[in-house]
A protein has these predicted regions:
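Conserved acidic
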Residues: 2-12, 20-27, 31-610
Length: 610
């Protein structure tokens, strides 16, 4: 549930560096969120010293103890950049921190919490600024290319101050909106992630009435639970969005357009039914039970089964190749599968050849009111020019993922904690290793058992949401027939001549669940591999490029010649992250250029050279 906000002092921080290197500080700005007091720093040590002075001043002025002090610093994408210059590897290693799969969400160093706002609002600072009416300026070229000869001007400092102001206003706006969403009489602590915020809002407003138990004190407690076997089975059925080159890779397809569905997941959450955690059960895996439950509109099922397609059955189910890659081209499936895809498969001529296990539960609609309320509210805000509508879009899209959180391995970096575990004879409960391998100077522990289990997990919601979405996407793909060339989660690229057929299945518009154009003017399309494609005109103008994991532009922002051509060597420009720095003995936050080539296409004849 939402947590009451404790007394705190908050700052935003932004640093400008000479080039893509977090260590090469030009200057930076720290801004008090509430008073807008600003401090310009030219060394990272000065920044940390100033923050400690403000912390001491805050404690003394308000009579707050060290234990109760809350000093928060927010940066945008800061644990991916700014903080990598502000701190050393050892400072981060010894910090009390929360991370998710290697991405640090918050780290407490010398009594100050350093947070990353981008884990809470996963859009760029320029998008936030535009929404809030505080437009972000363009990064001066001298900082992008690292030209120190031009020096630092007041205009540069004002640019950085504006970045802090955008973040400051974003924090205050989201705090106000979050409080209203939760119907809270008091101020609330902002969560660390978008999914956490969405879950807390849903819990505060739309928690299912029958989800409760009576504790030993004979008090009602809002809690839901089921046997682990049901959640584990649904976790096995949980698959993300379908991303596939449907046509022939590297082939040029002319006359191509693309459409994507507005708020795919929120739409399915509004329109569909989901399995009730509190009522999950199982029965004998007999086909008579399977058919009976499948026909019941008040029941949701999930089953461990084998499906085989008929002669004309199109492939659409998620399988894996022998190499472990996701595959969408097979008509035989074995494993756990949710009802939406089971029904769709049977409609397409698939047969159940083996039924191993059969689970089911009552069907409920836990998200209908949530989505309808916030979608309506967003439309009203948009009409009034209220910038807070940006937060609603993020909130609606993030909720389903919270229910699909997997166990998090308990990792211990802090040397004192490691020593304490060794001294108390508990080392056998952990895997002991070193980040730096044979050098053996950077130890860490990972718990053998006792992984952190998220309290909000119910894969029945997460797996059914994505299952419904994949069925909706496949229906659109089938409507496009042999004109479908590529798909990605909620979008499909297809021959424009197939649009009339598509409109029999989908509706074009701006409303929730309708589809809208990404590329409306027909042009040439090349799909290389998942998350890598190109739209290009007959005159060789690159209209849109998607290539995950590589840099499409150089330091000046100019498109590199090889962008969108996977037959050529590509490069990614980034900075060395915390764990990478330890593992590879590289300077934390330093610029890193990595060569990347496609295993499928590198060295082949380029389709752009015809």
């Amino acid at each position: 549930m939402p947590r009451k906000k404790k007394p705190s002092i908050r700052f935003t921080i932004d640093a400008e560096t000479w080039g893509l290197d977090a260590r090469k500080l030009a200057f930076g700005v720290i801004q008090n969120v509430d008073t807008l007091e600003q401090y310009v720093f030219y060394t990272y040590d000065d920044a940390k010293k100033w923050l400690q002075e403000k912390r001491k001043e805050y404690l003394e002025t308000n009579g707050i103890t060290e234990k109760d002090a809350r000093i928060l610093v927010y940066g945008h994408n800061a644990w991916k950049y700014d903080y990598l210059g502000l701190f050393t590897i050892d400072e981060i290693k010894q910090a009390d921190k929360i991370d998710a799969k290697g991405r640090i969400l918050v780290g407490t160093i010398d009594g100050i919490e350093y947070r990353d706002y981008k884990t809470l609002v996963q859009v760029s600072l320029s998008q936030i600024g535009e929404a809030l009416g505080f437009p972000k300026g363009i990064t001066p070229m001298k900082f992008r290319i690292g030209d120190e000869s031009q020096g630092i001007t007041q205009e540069d400092i004002d640019y950085c101050i504006q970045d802090c102001r955008i973040l400051t206003e974003a924090i205050k706006s989201l705090e106000t909106t979050y409080k209203e969403w939760c119907n809270s009489p008091h101020d609330l602590e902002l969560p660390l992630t978008t999914a956490s915020m969405a879950y807390r809002v849903w819990s505060a407003r739309y928690w299912p009435e029958h989800w409760f138990t009576i504790n030993k004190q004979d008090k009602k407690v809002d809690i839901a639970f089921c046997h682990n076997m049901f959640n584990d089975a649904l976790e096995e059925s949980y698959v993300g969005g379908r991303v596939q080159v449907i046509g022939e890779p590297m082939k040029i397809y002319p006359n191509t357009i693309s459409v994507d569905r507005n708020s795919m997941y929120p739409t399915e959450m509004r329109d569909q039914v989901f399995p009730d955690m509190m009522g999950a059960t199982y029965c004998k895996p007999y086909m008579v039970n399977f058919r009976k439950l499948l026909r019941d509109p008040d029941i949701c099922i999930w089953a461990n089964l084998t499906l085989e397609g008929g002669k004309d059955s199109p492939p659409f189910l998620a399988t894996k190749t022998e190499e472990g890659r996701r595959c969408w081209t097979r008509t035989e499936f074995t494993g756990w599968l949710c009802e939406p895809e089971i029904k769709h498969a049977l409609e397409l001529g698939y047969k159940v050849t083996e039924l191993k296990e059969l689970h089911y539960s009552q069907a409920i609609r836990p998200f209908k009111e949530f989505v309808e309320f916030f979608y309506k509210l967003r439309l009203e805000m948009r009409a009034k020019g209220d910038a807070s509508q940006l937060w609603i879009k993020l909130l609606m899209s993030a909720l389903y993922g919270r229910f699909g959180m997997k166990d998090i391995a308990v990792r211990i970096d802090n040397d004192e904690e490691i020593e304490k575990i060794i001294e108390t004879g508990k080392l056998d409960q952990y895997h002991f290793n070193y980040y730096d391998g044979r050098r053996g100077s950077l130890p860490f522990l990972v718990a053998i058992e006792g992984n952190k289990k998220p309290s909000s997990t119910w894969f029945g919601f997460a797996s059914f949401t994505t299952s419904y979405a994949r069925v909706s996407l496949n229906k659109a793909i089938l409507a496009a027939g042999d004109g479908a060339y590529y798909c990605d989660t909620d979008s499909i690229f297809f021959n424009a001549d197939k649009l009339p057929d598509m409109l029999e299945e989908i509706e074009i518009g701006n409303e929730l669940g309708q589809w809208d154009y990404e590329i409306e003017e027909p042009t040439n399309f090349i799909g290389y591999e998942p998350k890598a494609y190109l739209f290009i005109t007959d005159d060789k103008e690159k209209v849109k490029i998607r290539h995950k994991g590589v840099s499409l532009t150089d330091e000046t922002g100019k498109l590199v010649p090889q962008a969108g051509d996977l037959t050529k060597e590509q490069f990614s420009r980034n900075v060395i992250q915390y764990r990478t720095a330890m593992r590879r003995n590289l300077p934390l936050g330093s610029k890193h250029i990595q060569s990347k080539v496609s295993k499928r296409h590198y060295g082949k004849k380029s389709p752009l050279e015809d």
